[in-house]
Swiss-Prot record:
Enzyme Commission number: 2.7.1.202
Domain PTS EIIA type-2: 4-149
Broad EC category: transferase
Stretches assigned to the PTS EIIB type-2 domain: 179-275
Lineage: Bacteria, Bacillati, Mycoplasmatota, Mycoplasmoidales, Mycoplasmoidaceae
Keywords: Cell membrane, Kinase, Membrane, Phosphoprotein, Phosphotransferase system, Sugar transport, Transferase, Transmembrane, Transmembrane helix, Transport
Modified sites of kind Phosphocysteine: 185
Catalytic activity: D-fructose(out) + N(pros)-phospho-L-histidyl-[protein] = D-fructose 1-phosphate(in) + L-histidyl-[protein]
GO molecular function: carbohydrate:proton symporter activity; kinase activity; protein-N(PI)-phosphohistidine-fructose phosphotransferase system transporter activity; protein-phosphocysteine-sugar phosphotransferase activity
Subcellular location: Cell membrane
Gene name tied to this protein: fruA
UniProt-recorded name of the protein: PTS system fructose-specific EIIABC component
Role summary: The phosphoenolpyruvate-dependent sugar phosphotransferase system (sugar PTS), a major carbohydrate active transport system, catalyzes the phosphorylation of incoming sugar substrates concomitantly with their translocation across the cell membrane. This system is involved in fructose transport.
Comment text on domains: The PTS EIIA type-2 domain is phosphorylated by phospho-HPr on a histidyl residue. Then, it transfers the phosphoryl group to the PTS EIIB type-2 domain.
Amino acid sequence: MFKPLLSAELFFNWTAKDFKDKTSFLKQACRVLQDKNCIKEEQIALTALKEREAQITTGIMSKLALPHMQSATVLKPFVAVFKVNNVDWQSLDNQPVKLIFLIGVPKDQGNLHLEFISQFSKLMLQDEFANKVPNIRSFNGLINLIDSFQQTAVASQPVVNEAAAQTEEPKDTNTQYDFVAVTACPTGIAHTFMAKEALEKFARDHNLKVKVETQGTDGIQNQLTESDLNNTKGIILACDRLIDLTRFYGHANVVEVSTTKAIKTPQTVYDQVVKKEGKLLGNKSSDSASQTELKETTEQLSFKDFHKRIYRAILSGVSYMLPFVVFGGILIAIAFLIDINNAGNAGKQFGSKDPIANWFKTLGGLSFGLIVPILSAYIAFALVGRQGLLPGFIVGLISAGKFLLNIDIVTGKIDWATESKVSSGFFGAIFGGLLAAVLIIVQQRYIYRKLPQALQGIKNILFIPLLGTLVTAALFWVINIPLIYLNYGLSKFLQIMDKPYLAPLLGLVIGLMMCFDLGGPVNKAAYVFGVVSLESQNSGTVAMASAILSGMVPPLGIAIAATIRKQCFDKEELPAAYACYVMGLSFISEGAIPFVAKRPKIMLAANLIGGAVCGVLTGAFALTIRAPHGGVFVFALLKTNLEGIAGNTLQIGAGVGLALLALIVSSFISAGIIIGHNLLVVRKKTKQLVNTNA
């Protein structure tokens, strides 16, 4: 059972302490757990626990809380028990907490925390246990209470629940469950199992035959079969997160509630099943399109919180786009490297004069040419599901200039029937993806809503893909005109910023952004801006060079600091710190994330200062690069446009040398800040020790 996780050493009576809220408790608890060698870093543990609490409270009623974490900072599995005096935990029943079980499991170990929560949930659903456990005052009292009620629980386990717990299909296909259920919460831990136990206890108390599936961090357990779904009076989905609804399509009386409601009022939930207040999910049409419309929920196909979803949709589109950028960009970089002998005389044909180089450049160009359509398609997909893919991709192709309508930017003359030679680029992709999503929602909610039932089956395979995409493309064809001018303006802006007197400022901004959150939205925005500059100018740019070189600084600074002064890091961190040489040289900024998470203040300062210096030097040296990724492996594609350096070969050679200089200087500055901070900390501790001994 779960008792081996409990120990007298980790039982704390803190009734004399006063905590204004759960955050103040967690801070002190993490400090004690670090002293007990349960965790490595109290700040990381505190962050993990606070993030879990932000999803849904772990105050489970009966004046108990089960905060938990699975983190690399946990050294060994543990359950620490804290007896406290009425801590406000924002619990499900709005009652203050008197007893706290704080659970920690290492990142790479099993699911002991799940077993504890599952077993403890069963005990908590016994009213007498729930009433007694908050009042225990000692470790032995807790163990004795658990022992007595575990024996009771085993002795009273009903046969009907054993049958319900079987995953195989019933032998008698006419035998019905009173209800079947699925439970799932954002973390897949406490509330998932609490809801399961609450529903099963309710069934036992009322002599009902049930089966409950859990979708937790250990995967799907006790999975419902098609036979189970066909032989039940109702289906309860007690879920706080999105799950795959496909297998429930065509089944009636589906009741959707939160895990909290299932835990607190299972009677009310069951009454909904009895009164047949559940709904019919989807339909059981044989059309494959109807059967595969999973995750396109009512909320998704509506304008509810649409403005809040736009930001996440754009980031989602960027994440789908990046593999095309990296693949295409690196192949183009390889083409330039193969064709390096022709760098001095190939002119605009550089990278394609050699047949093999031309093969790589053409293939890379195919991938690179898809980044705008992919971005648009997956922005629409993130907002409305797969119905947004087709119109999103089409408007993305129009944005990329793959359709009719050519504009003379200077005169403003429009030729509607000529193949386009201009594009709206990323502006068109973002606006087009949003437009496609909006029109899909309008069609689903307001136009095709009242179609006869006989036509509903072909709505999603004919009306929306055909007519909807035609309308979207026609509207965007016209709307795209101002977006083309906007993209042209960006191109001109980038050309201005590449000038010697402004390039350092551009490098400074991009350098700071690249090193701010290391793979987060600010970092991605800076990187995408660099990619946009390549797409807009069709040549190497200062923006792209600044993004790549600055993004290499954080991991390199860490590696250099570890090499010069090992004491800057814990012994177990040193291998990862040395590995940052490879990470940094490969332009993988995320290699620095574990170190930033552990020492956020000093590491962020070192990263930002190092990145800013690198960006300024990149701009001052007028460095440009044609590849969007690759780190040191694409340095041969660097050039400098400094005055006085003429000729392609000399520009490349000087560009590589100046880039190495900028990278080395900024990385050593970053490392120096880390080392300096460590020396100050050691000096401060030494001084305190001397004063104490004195």
